[in-house]
Amino acid sequence: MKHGIKALLITLSLACAGMSHSALAAASVAKPTAVETKAEAPAAQSKAAVPAKASDEEGTRVSINNASAEELARAMNGVGLKKAQAIVSYREEYGPFKTVEDLKQVPGMGNSLVERNLAVLTL
């Protein structure tokens, strides 16, 4: 009986060791592919960001007191249609902005988001 249990345990341990070795080998083969994909993604993003900055340098500025939500979303970096609509709603409820820094009072607009877009915003 003891020999049977020992044989069973040895067989199971060898089988588990073999399966874990195969799983580790497969995982190490898959990892470089994931790393290559991540490395290629920032390069594509940086290429896409260059044309957007070129249009900002042309002098396209948008008035936060007169622009529609669509215009704000198009001009501001990191602001989608929903946040742009929040800006317009805030403006309609509380009146025109007195400074560009007043955008920080709009829900969802943080300091970094306002600072990032100061170059394209005007009253």
From Swiss-Prot:
Q: Spell out the residue ranges making up region: Disordered.
A: 40-62
Q: Which Gene3D superfamilies match?
A: AF1531-like domain
UniProt keyword terms in alphabetical order: Repeat, Signal
InterPro entries membership: Competence_ComEA_HhH, Endo/Exo/Phosphatase_dom_1, Hlx-hairpin-Hlx_DNA-bd_motif, RuvA_2-like
Q: Which organism is it from?
A: Escherichia coli (strain K12)
Residue ranges, compositional bias (Low complexity): 40-53
This chain belongs to the protein called Uncharacterized protein YbaV
Q: Name one GO cellular component term.
A: outer membrane-bounded periplasmic space
The HhH domain covers 60-90, 91-120
Q: One GO biological process from the UniProt record?
A: DNA repair
Gene behind this protein = ybaV
* Molecular function per GO: DNA binding
Q: What span is annotated as the signal peptide, if there is one? A: 1-25
